[in-house]
Amino acid sequence: MYRELPVWRSLMYVPVNVEKFVDKAHTRGADVIQLDVEDSVPPAEKANARKLVEKNAARVKRGGADVVVRINQPLSLAVRDIEASICPDVNGIAITKVSGVSHVQLLDELVSELEQKRGMTIGHTKCIGMIETPEAFFKIRDITTACSRMVACNIGG
């Protein structure tokens, strides 16, 4: 099976809530700007950070980069992050601490529902699986083939 993959050679992490970084990100030449709502955002600021995703995705995209949003774990936070991230200017989500196939498939189902509700093409939003545990490392083949959105993975977080 052939599917077209994005060209994502370089990825730059940008905290979605730090204005000075967001403002300059589009000038840095990365293939992907990864707006972070996970570790770089303090817990007390996460709700506000989610409100910034759509607007800041459009801003960092000005230089031609694709935009990915790194989401939180646990599931309750991941769902809120995904709800804030599914929009035409976001090309993908980075799923942190992937635990296995069912984890990926659950989030894939949510993304599809949101894309449909928002009038987007199903499959627009790609996934990067972040393999951060030894258990997930040994499931990497299954994780990377768990859904057609999965286009990349990284090891170590």
Question: Which stretches of residues belong to each language-model region?
Answer:
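Conserved alpha/beta-domain cores
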Residues: 2-157
